[in-house]
């Protein structure tokens, strides 16, 4: 090996290392940057903007905001729960009650980004769900459970109101798409 090829090999190794870092950080960085744009879109929605999409080509828009005071969580909830939507934030599951209305509100998110904090929730913790009229609805966590995806009747009619937060499980799984789901159930505070 000549002395001239050593700098080239070093440069190639540097580029490969940088590429590996960028590839590994892509999803967390995208999730972080999207939250800034989503916060601005949420403010536009609260002000009554007709189009509150976070960027012009977005196929979703902010629908609500979820906060958990003890953990310092504050996230915009998007309309829909497709993979493209969930790449940017938690999403409202179609067919469930809309945030702020009576019924079973279901919100899903990825276990390794936006809903990683679900594993730290405790029974009795408060969840605040803000709707686009600016009102906060307070819920208390009553249960966290692990279910197989086939046994979750998330959209079944229920007696009373509740909020369910849903993510894949286990939180530290190496590969995505497992059959287990982590479900947090919360009832309106004072109920």
Descriptions of predicted regions:
Residues 1-6:
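Short, Lys/Arg-rich N-terminal segment immediately upstream of the first membrane anchor
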Residues 7-191:
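Solvent-exposed, non-transmembrane regions of membrane-associated and secreted proteins
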């Amino acid at each position: 090996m000549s002395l001239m090829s050593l700098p080239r090999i070093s440069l190639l190794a540097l580029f490969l290392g940088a590429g590996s870092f960028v590839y590994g950080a892509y999803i967390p960085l995208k999730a972080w940057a999207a939250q800034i744009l989503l916060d601005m879109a949420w403010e536009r929605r609260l002000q009554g903007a007709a189009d509150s999409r976070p960027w012009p080509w977005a196929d979703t828009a902010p629908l609500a905001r979820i906060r958990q005071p003890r953990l310092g969580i504050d996230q915009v909830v998007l309309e829909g729960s497709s993979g493209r939507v969930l790449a940017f934030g938690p999403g409202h599951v179609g067919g469930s009650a809309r945030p702020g209305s009576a019924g079973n509100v279901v919100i899903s998110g990825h276990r390794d980004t936006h809903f990683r904090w679900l594993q730290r929730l405790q029974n009795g913790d408060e969840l605040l769900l803000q709707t686009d009229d600016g009102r906060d609805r307070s819920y208390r966590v009553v249960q966290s459970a692990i279910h197989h995806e086939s046994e979750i009747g998330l959209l079944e009619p229920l007696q009373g109101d509740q909020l369910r937060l849903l993510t894949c499980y286990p939180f530290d799984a190496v590969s995505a798409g497992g059959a287990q789901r982590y479900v947090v159930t919360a009832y309106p505070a004072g109920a």
